[in-house]
Regions:
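Conserved nucleotide-sensing/catalytic segment adjacent to the nucleotide-binding pocket
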Residues: 33-106
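Structured core elements
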Residues: 11, 39, 44, 54, ...
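Conserved NTP phosphate-binding and transfer environment spanning the P-loop NTPase/kinase superfamily
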Residues: 83-310
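Flexible loop/turn segments at secondary-structure boundaries
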Residues: 18-21, 44-47, 61, 135-137, ...
Length: 310
């Protein structure tokens, strides 16, 4: 809720370790009259009313950032991949911070978040795809429903410590996880069409946020939160990004998007080509189970063709 009483509902999508919980639970130094948090993991959006509903009454959180004795830990209901020890007073204490083994987790009460709600009636205003892709500027605004939806379907990120990976996996290699949901049990086109509808029929805005590095320079949480606040407050000024017709960028801090840097443009072309290749593979892998409509292929191919001019 903003100072003028208007509401802005942001829907954020990213894998574990991408920064989505940091964005979700940020207090923004108390500058807004009210912040309501639906959930930082599992929720659905009604594509007719654009209201949002949480799917879980609790949180399933990493314990790596919450030291033993931390006051937040009193909200933990059960723990996994953690151990326990006895302190000098004979009390049992939880051992967190991934000391015993990696990916310590806990079921955390929703009471941990004082501003937590189970439903947001106000319609969603914007979708944010969170990526850790070093070719993506700190923020991009996507125009057109097909491009907005296909960029979510080709959400690229680095593997984090929150995930089990095969031995030998390159943790710096980008991989694509559609809509940041590795647990989908239905055809990918279902999600694609729903996100497309939100943008096309419900006028929901769509952005990509890079929470990793941009060409060697770290995008800090303060940058990302500042970008989010600028958008929420209606102060964001986006401008044309080189040859791209449907992607706009907003200058931020000292992040320089230099399209005359051949090393950068080569990596950018490669990153966009990888997205096109992924969409094309959806049509053949698993017998075409995750095939996307032709407009999805056309939208990302247009970006690849535009990038070729660089």
């Amino acid at each position: 809720t903003l100072a003028d009483g208007s509401k802005f509902v942001a829907s954020v999508y990213g894998l574990s370790g991408s920064g989505k919980s940091t964005l979700t639970h940020a207090k923004h130094n108390g500058k807004y009259p009210a912040i309501k948090v639906l959930h930082d993991d599992a929720f659905i959006i009604n594509t007719d009313t654009c209201a949002s509903i949480a799917l879980e009454p609790t949180y399933f959180d990493k314990t790596a950032d919450y030291p033993t004795g931390c006051p937040d830990n009193k909200y933990l209901l059960s723990c996994q991949n953690c151990s326990a020890t006895m302190d000098e007073d004979g009390k049992i204490q939880l051992v967190t911070e991934d000391i015993r083994n990696g990916n310590g987790r806990a079921i955390k009460s929703k009471l941990w978040s004082p501003n937590r709600v189970d439903k947001i009636e106000s319609p969603v205003n914007a979708i944010f795809w969170i990526m850790k892709d070093p070719t993506i500027p700190p923020v991009i605004k996507l125009k057109g429903s097909s491009l907005a939806a296909v960029m979510g379907a080709t959400l690229a990120t680095k593997t984090s410590t929150a995930e089990r990976v095969k031995a030998g996996t390159d943790l710096n290699a980008l991989r694509i996880v559609p809509y940041a949901n590795p647990f989908r049990t239905y055809p990918l086109a279902n999600d694609y069409e729903k996100f497309k509808k939100l943008v096309e029929e419900k006028n929901v805005a769509c952005y990509i946020i890079n929470t990793g590095d941009f060409m060697g320079k770290k995008v800090k949480p303060a940058d990302t939160l500042g970008i989010l606040e600028t958008i929420v407050e209606g102060k964001a000024k986006f401008e044309k990004w080189g040859p791209f017709e449907d992607m706009e960028i907003m200058p931020w801090g000292d992040f320089e998007v230099n399209l005359n840097d051949k090393d950068y443009t080569a990596q950018l072309k490669n990153a966009m080509q990888n997205r096109l290749t992924s969409v094309e593979k959806f049509a053949t892998d698993k017998g075409g189970y995750d095939k996307l409509p032709d407009d999805a292929v056309a939208a990302i191919k247009k970006v690849v063709d535009e990038a070729a001019a660089l």
